[in-house]
From Swiss-Prot:
Record key words, sorted: Amino-acid biosynthesis, Aromatic amino acid biosynthesis, Lyase, Tryptophan biosynthesis
Gene Ontology BP term (one): L-tryptophan biosynthetic process
Subunit structure, interactors included: Tetramer of two alpha and two beta chains.
Entry protein name: Tryptophan synthase alpha chain
Entries under InterPro entries matching the protein: Aldolase_TIM, RibuloseP-bd_barrel, Trp_synthase_alpha_AS, Trp_synthase_suA
Length: 268
């Protein structure tokens, strides 16, 4: 049983959904980033979704673009990212860790090499934002070879053909988009998602986590009531980091408070 399966089983037994925060590794700097990731887990995050800093994050709104720029300015390289992940993994043996990234970073040292490094660091899943299902074969093959779960996005406008491919190729969880467009807490999630969740279930897709525009506990509760296995929040988390750049201690306190409130909303 992989870590995602074990997590969803535990949460189901406890009548809870998953709360999964997203942060960019190395934002605002590698040392504080490590403290941030651990704080999120300690405050109740069920899993982590992590971005590797990239200079041209197409699917991201201004908040996460800012996080990428801060991490790159702090000299965060893929090597440093994997080192930080390995440290988080050593401290948290059961917490699923997912990467959400762009294909260029996977290609940089070869696809196999990338997934092998993921395996070594303790990564559970990889979602490549700019690779659709019909171009995913080399990535899926490498993921399977190294025991990594390939994650795919189910957009709200998806055809049955796309959803079938997402269900067949995806492992771990399905990233369910609450709306089209770029990431950002400024743009609210479009509920309801019942119909899309029902279609995913028909195709026997992995459990769905709802993302894009999730910034408050009521949305988490809504997502779980609609049938999602949980919710992912990125821009709202990164916004807290951005707001408290000059006060690292306050930054951690505010992140913990936000995570606790969001996690509380997952209790069915």
């Amino acid at each position: 049983m992989n870590r995602y399966q074990a997590l969803f089983q535990r949460l189901s037994a406890a009548q809870q959904g998953a709360f999964v925060p997203f942060v960019t590794i190395g934002d605002p700097n590698p040392e504080q980033s490590l403290a941030i990731m651990q704080t999120l887990i300690d405050a109740g995050a069920d899993a982590l979704e992590l971005g590797m800093p990239f200079s041209d994050p197409l699917a991201d709104g201004p908040t996460i673009q800012g996080a990428n720029l801060r991490a790159l300015a702090a000299k965060t390289t893929p090597d440093i990212c994997f080192e930080l992940i390995a440290q988080i993994r050593a401290r948290n043996p059961e917490t699923p860790i997912g990467l959400l990234m762009y294909a260029n970073l996977v290609y940089a040292r070869g696809i196999d090499d990338f997934y092998q490094r993921c395996q070594k660091a303790g990564v559970d899943s990889v979602l490549i934002a700019d690779v659709p299902t019909n171009e995913s074969q080399p990535f899926v093959a490498a993921a399977e070879k190294f025991g990594i779960q390939p994650i795919f996005i189910a957009p709200p406008t998806a055809s049955d053909e796309t959803l079938r491919a997402v269900a067949q190729l995806g492992k771990g969880y399905t990233y369910l988009l609450s709306r089209a467009g770029v990431t950002g807490a400024e743009t609210k999630a479009n509920m309801p998602v019942h119909a899309l969740l029902e279609r995913l279930q028909q195709f026997d897709a992995p459990p769905a986590l709802l993302g894009f525009g999730i910034s408050e506990p009521a949305q988490v509760k809504q997502a779980i009531e609609a049938g999602a296995a949980g919710a992912i929040s990125g821009s709202a988390v990164v916004k807290i980091i951005e707001t408290h750049l000059d006060n690292p201690a306050k930054q951690l306190t505010e992140l913990a408070n936000f995570t606790q409130a969001m996690k509380k909303a997952t209790k069915i």
